[in-house]
């Protein structure tokens, strides 16, 4: 039996830089697939945003492992989405000695 409860479907997304038609570029996110995860909250804080205060919350997200280089293995330049919630991946490592699970350290930013 697993010590992780992978009961939340989360979309793994990757950014693509596209021309915006005005000489610049726009960032567009597209889904690579769905991963089942367990979400564990960490520390949170409030900081000054451009318009209003912003809350920043850190999370640990546990997933089934995938080999290095696999498109199913998250990377720090990607993000996980659960509905309207977006979690930017900061770091990825093995969660257990057997290498059966991964832990993604992620940040969710929401308006306060």
What are these regions (language model features)?
Residues 24-112:
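Short, conserved turn/kink motifs that form compact alpha/beta structural patches or helix kinks used as
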């Amino acid at each position: 039996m697993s010590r992780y409860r992978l009961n939340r479907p989360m979309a793994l997304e990757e950014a693509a830089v596209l021309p915006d038609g005005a000489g610049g570029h726009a960032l567009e996110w597209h889904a690579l697939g769905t991963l089942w995860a367990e979400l564990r909250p960490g520390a949170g804080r409030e900081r000054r945003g451009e318009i209003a205060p912003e809350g920043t919350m850190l999370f640990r997200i546990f997933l089934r492992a995938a080999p290095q280089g696999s498109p199913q293995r998250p990377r720090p330049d990607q993000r996980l989405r659960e509905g309207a919630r977006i979690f930017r991946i900061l770091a990825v490592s093995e969660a257990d000695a057997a290498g059966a699970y991964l832990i993604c350290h992620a940040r969710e930013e929401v308006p306060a």
